């Protein structure tokens, strides 16, 4: 495409882009994803005839642009990964022992595949690589036109005689540590298979030859080989388009156009940095590979040779600026990738593994829509927020000061500590399973409020009035007048009420001898405590009237060891003066 090629030439010449310096280089390749034709080549800057072509000859480590090709693509294809698949971003090692870290030196914990790939976390990428059979990874990558070998005996094994590097796959490939390297044209060709629905088409610049002498025309065509399922291609497109639209685009975002992209960085080792006299953390290669439903674009940015005067810092802004200039010449398109019948979109409940469907009462902020290969989507409904079961065996008996209600209740297994311990022992939660367990317990106790029982009275209109909440399996109900009261006990969280049980009702018949006019008293403590001498503060008493806390306006007296006190502070003083022994308050 002459107009696109002219635009790339303007970018490289400096006519339409201001470069960081005169030495920094770039290689650019743009292909048509539907027929494999090379649309434009940016061979480099300040070139003369015969110079090195940075788009087609420069073999460079691809950094994180390798992750869709070596990790998540094979995972979608062979291991039924979904965009929801969970990975624990935690301290991790390669199989042979060395530690692997993330670019920012931190860990994000449990994240989805969508998040892991979008923000380019290294540890989930390695974990994905480790989960897929290596032979399948080699098959997938070779199918995209990138030559990697399973073993030194493989027919396609090759070795660079100049530096000893080879194309033998290993775990470093998961984050782009390819010793042999790739060119921008290689990457544009590979990513095109995602864009076109799963077909590899070898890139080519010649479509036909016309012989002047004879007038004969020879047409050239290349094979269009199905190299991955359409579900794999769509899932990758969905994630990488999400990355672009949420800020992780490497300069590839074009407003009003459908774009998917992945960035990549290859860092120099600390030893190399020291040897060259450049800052630790310096970068060798910067990449952005982007594509639309029509074009695939690969940009490499860096120096021919790194030395103390020519090196990249950690910032990708200069490369991103080049990519923005390049994308101005890539035709916009509002065409989107149509979801194939082999993929289904499903709303799942967050933090479930395996993925489960939300219940009717799952909070909205705990729901997320993700994409699955058809037939692998979740079908089981999560019980985490499901409606709580009703109390059973609800009884009433007259006692001193009221009518004692008692009941039985079985906590659902999903809320039991032993169940949660087993749940969080799954390998996906990794070495932090204990902290995830404690976090869930804290959430249940603090955010949801802990499970207890709401006590309700049904009024004449049939509506319910909540008069108390207790964590005990009993409650002393004091009627407000004589006659029959309809009391309902519901299992519920103290704060989160959406999934409260339907409620179990009992009729309490009062002869009028016990009337409260709405006043109810409940102890905050109600337990036997062993406390150190002179270091105790009592919880006191709570008084409610028609469900409202009236403790501060109530006249409450406390008695301990035969003495009466009118305030909690006086009670605390008295308790702390007691000799060692057993007392009742």
What annotation goes with each model-predicted range?
Residues 1-60, 65, 141, 395-398, ...:
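Periplasmic/cell-envelope proteins involved in peptidoglycan metabolism and beta-lactam response
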Residues 2-18, 28-30, 41, 47-58, ...:
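A penicillin-recognizing enzyme superfamily signal
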Residues 8, 36, 59-87, 116, ...:
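Active-site SXXK
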Residues 80-137, 170, 200, 212-242:
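Conserved catalytic neighborhood of penicillin-recognizing serine enzymes
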Residues 98-101, 133-189:
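Mid-domain, small-residue-enriched loop/turn segments at the edges of structured enzyme/sensor domains
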Residues 259-518:
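Soluble, non-transmembrane domains of envelope/secretory-pathway proteins that act on or interact
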Residues 517-548:
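Solvent-exposed, low-complexity, repeat-rich "mucin-like" stalks and linkers
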Residues 548-585:
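Serine/threonine-rich, repeat-prone extracellular segments and beta-strand-based repeat modules
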